[in-house]
From Swiss-Prot:
Resulting phenotype, F129 to A/S: Abolished interaction with herpes simplex and pseudorabies glycoprotein D. Decreases susceptibility to infection by herpes simplex virus
Protein name: Nectin-1
Phosphoserine found at: S422, S434, S435, S511
Paired cysteines (S-S): C51-C124, C172-C226, C269-C316
Superkingdom, natural source: Eukaryota
Domain remark in the UniProt entry: The Ig-like V-type domain is involved in homophilic interaction in cis, a prerequisite for cell adhesion. Ig-like C2-type 2 mediates neurite outgrowth through binding, induction of phosphorylation, and activation of FGFR.
Family label: Belongs to the nectin family.
Amino acid sequence: MARMGLAGAAGRWWGLALGLTAFFLPGVHSQVVQVNDSMYGFIGTDVVLHCSFANPLPSVKITQVTWQKSTNGSKQNVAIYNPSMGVSVLAPYRERVEFLRPSFTDGTIRLSRLELEDEGVYICEFATFPTGNRESQLNLTVMAKPTNWIEGTQAVLRAKKGQDDKVLVATCTSANGKPPSVVSWETRLKGEAEYQEIRNPNGTVTVISRYRLVPSREAHQQSLACIVNYHMDRFKESLTLNVQYEPEVTIEGFDGNWYLQRMDVKLTCKADANPPATEYHWTTLNGSLPKGVEAQNRTLFFKGPINYSLAGTYICEATNPIGTRSGQVEVNITEFPYTPSPPEHGRRAGPVPTAIIGGVAGSILLVLIVVGGIVVALRRRRHTFKGDYSTKKHVYGNGYSKAGIPQHHPPMAQNLQYPDDSDDEKKAGPLGGSSYEEEEEEEEGGGGGERKVGGPHPKYDEDAKRPYFTVDEAEARQDGYGDRTLGYQYDPEQLDLAENMVSQNDGSFISKKEWYV
């Protein structure tokens, strides 16, 4: 027993020594088995599992390549390549696994016709000497495409008045998918969907969705589509609902213009029903139909000319296998036909947008406001005094008329005749010349006795053209000319002053050509 213990201890030490030798041997860490980390494939398809040995050293000898599957913590051989023994594939892969390029550096295999049981962890192992075994593993996922379909309910859908309970109308199924698919609905209906997942023993999942709603007339002929999304695929299938409902009745034919003696009028009963209405019954609110009125199925004919006895409320009852509903119309008889007024030109041309009408009206209003403002401004400018309203600056005339405006006198004679006994002081001087004695004396005293005869004195000519005097100027002139006699001849050019003067509120006149500061 002691020998066996020593042998066991020696074996353990020898194994440890080999391991340390392999660990410190140069180039050991560069020897790597390369595989794909994960692979996936669909049931019934083929998948290639890559495996290669990288950077082999010349001193390292490869003896065997082995593929294994990890099952419940244990390893199960799948395929083996040995240079001396050849290729060996074990059951249940014998007919479905093959090496593509068997060699000491390439152990790639093909797994054909995938089954759900093929899913799992696969190990690729290279046996080397003296460094030992080198391996890597990959994960294979097997996917199953689901089978999808939609089916409507086998029960008859009937819309009933006052019904609030939702009933099953369609079922969408996505069966045996792996992983499970995503199911949804596409419709305008106001219903609700419920979902259920069933996990099958082989690992696949079946998804079932049921759609429920309250049957109604509005739901009839509406489309309901089932949408299944799986991996990169999208499935869509739809159906059209068939909902039975009782008739919805309307009466047509009365246009509001039934008048005396009108001919060839009728009423038609229209029933929206599923299945279609099979029976129609006409009555009036009073009971029986008037004389001259005949019912033929869904049409009510009025024979002969219209008279007042045909006025009243007419009722049509329509019946189908689901139920009976009625509709009514009130008929009025007038003495004369109603003739609508012809449409306006603008209406015939089409409605004018409100924005255009508002824009045109606003533009016209703006133009009127601007024109009115200009007119008011011009009138104020014409009738308003622009000068200084100080009490010191009153406006006087030029001494020959009130407020500075020359009066429109008839032309004066060139030579005025005075009696011989007239006072010399009252006689005017020669027309066209100066008539003031003091001015003559000033001219004689200061000007050497020379004076121009036959024309106005320059000073008086200048004063005559002035439209006004200030208060100071007026007082000064009153001192100098108060005792003198006017002998000035009117100049025709001064008559134009009246055309250029504007009347003021205080009775005075202001020239339009002057600005007063």
